[in-house]
Amino acid sequence: MSSKSKSIGIIGAPFSKGQPRGGVEEGPTVLRKAGLLEKLKEQEHDVTDYGDLSFADVPNDSPFHIVKNPRAVGRANEQLAGAVAEIKKNGRISLVLGGDHSLAIGSISGHASVCPDLAVIWVDAHTDINTPLTTTSGNLHGQPVSFLLKELKGKIPDVPGFSWVTPCISAKDIVYIGLRDVDPGEHYIVKTLGIKYFSMTEVDKLGIGKVMEETLCYLLGRKKRPIHLSFDVDGLDPSFTPATGTPVAGGLSYREGIYITEAIHKTGLLSGLDIMEVNPSLGKTPEEVTRTVNTAVALTLASFGVAREGNHKPIDYLHPPK
């Protein structure tokens, strides 16, 4: 292993019940089929594949108020939290292949149980910070951040399946990038808690270079700490990731997405990565599915050091001919 190589633990989370559309549970399968593990190994990373979690059906999972599938989502996240904690205890960077974005509850909880001073970068068209009481859809993939924030303790009712969750990050520990579809209740929460965000307006105004400079300065300025990148592929414009459940026009470009992941890699502090909401059933054509999957793979590889300028091994490529 070279000095740049990382120890990575990959866990698939084929789960879809945080939202209504079938197919997102196939995310781990299509990402693996695209050669993600082989491509990481080509970069001389030490990759351990922990396989895919298996989620049991939860009978009689009646809604809580309007929140759908609460027990299934709660239980799946508890399983994922345990798996991610195990990967972190083994000294590896956790790579979670989703699945819908409700799984960030488990991924970040498990990560924070081992690395408590976590910083979270959340790339998404949405803030995913509705509470079970502010949600208008009842879909838990729009609520994960509300379960994770200490400041919202007391604002979250006792949802069946979630008794294991302890809020593990503060409002000052998270930065959003790519926002462009935020509910009024979510906007109120983000503003009231003073959460740092770069909506597409700020990305347009500042450019992605400045956005990343400010993001990393804000999260790491006082001290270096582990970074958890939770990447919803709908953060990118639907022209690059069409096969996803809640696409919103006017998103991050492919180049901006890659720049975000390159900048995080360069800190040397990436400690956990979620690649979420790839849904192969929602591509209108096979090409749309391929485009989405290839983009998700490229974002992952850039997070682990694949650079657009090229990469080379630490050898002398110019040794004289024999």
UniProtKB/Swiss-Prot annotation:
Domain of life (superkingdom): Eukaryota
Cofactor: how bound: Binds 2 manganese ions per subunit.
Q: Which cofactor does it need?
A: Mn(2+)
What GO cellular component is one of the record's annotations?
nucleus
Binding positions (Mn(2+) 2)? 124, 126, 232, 234
**Entry keyword annotation includes Oxidoreductase:** no
Binding positions (substrate)? 126-130, 137-139, 183, 246, 277
Q: Region (Disordered): which ranges?
A: 1-26
Instruction: Point out residues bearing the modification Phosphoserine.
Output: 7, 62, 163
Q: Does the keyword Cytoplasm apply?
A: yes
Residues annotated for Mn(2+) 1 binding in this entry? 101, 124, 128, 232
Q: What does the UniProt entry say about where the protein is found?
A: Cytoplasm
Which reactions are catalysed by this chain? L-arginine + H2O = urea + L-ornithine
Instruction: Name the family.
Output: Belongs to the arginase family.
Q: What is this protein called?
A: Arginase-1
What gene is it encoded by?
Answer: ARG1
